[in-house]
Amino acid sequence: CQKPLTHTVYEAREITKAARYYNVQTQMGNQGHSSEHIRLLKEWLADGVLGPVTEVHAWTDRPVGGDPWSTFAVQARPQDTPPVPETLNWDLWLGPVAYRPYHPDYHPMKWRAWLDFGTGALGDMGCHILDPAFWALDLGAPDTIEATSTHWEENVAGQTFPRASIVRYRFPARGERPPVKLTWYDGRLMPPMPEELEPGRTLPDSGAIIIGKKGKIIHGSHGAGSMRLIPESRMQEYKRPEKTIPRVLGSHEGDWIRACKEGRNGTPASSSFEYGGALTEMALLGMIAIRVKNQILRWDHDALRFVNNAKADELLHIPYRPGWTL
């Protein structure tokens, strides 16, 4: 199943429970989770290369950076009703959401911008870019989330995601590991340039900075690609630890096929719904914070609710049109 796994937090929780109950082999399409780099990152952090990690900054240039839906969020809701392509079952494509007539401003691809169908830049790319820190640091569920954003364009206010946003998560301590503050930036907003980065070096268009008491790591999108300690001298000096995490042999898709062939008692795929569901929940909680904006949301993971914001609670799921249930 592609990332994000679901449209709503409730759906992510339910589909994870269903996969667990029926004991089936599953895989979410965050292919970086099968990479070598993400395993190296987890091993290096376990080795103490950064010391206790307290801060993460992650960003994407989307929805501005060259995407087919990059300029769409400023347009008005389409009013004309062109014919549905012969190759498309529009009713099935809509699934459980409220009916709207077909329009190419929704599909293909541009659906990501619309609240009806998509989850914005954070839902689109968070399961790639936040994956390394979420896994390597065993972050689990946040206890607070808050967001700020650019304004919505007048013609689509409350219908699309904003051009750019910043989301701040706080994750509680995990055993001896300290709390972590994770900040997400999209729409070409960026974190401050690390002072350890040498002159002439720049941050990637999408990626993350992981900050510990003993140093920093920068990586790109999709499974901590192009991971480097900074400054570069630290990268050259670091004595790599032994590789202890099992590697995926072949592709992300091939790993799922391998799991299916092994059957119910086999080794799960690298990003099974047990993991992918939790990662999706984290990303979609940030999406809700963007929609309520400028509110500190306190999250109760076990109860599946925000303890201090009824409006945010309503966004955990959507009404389904007749014929669809979960």
Feature names for model-found ranges:
Residues 81-82, 86-272, 280-288, 292-302, ...:
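Glycine-rich, aromatic-lined ligand/substrate-binding cores of catalytic
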Residues 313-326:
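Tryptophan-rich aromatic "cage" segments
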Residues 5-12, 31-35, 60-62, 222-224, ...:
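Short, solvent-exposed turn/loop segments enriched in Gly/Ser/Thr/Pro and often Arg
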Residues 9-12, 18-20, 38, 66, ...:
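Active-site-proximal cap/loop segments of hydrolase catalytic domains
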Residues 25-27, 57, 218:
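Structural detector of well-ordered beta-strand residues that form the stable sheet scaffold
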Residues 37-93:
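Rossmann-like NAD(P)H-binding beta-loop-alpha module
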Residues 15, 41, 285:
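Aromatic/hydrophobic pocket-lining residues that form π-stacking "cages" and hydrophobic walls in ligand
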Residues 1-34, 48, 294:
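Beta-strand-loop-alpha-helix segment that lines the small-molecule cofactor/substrate pocket
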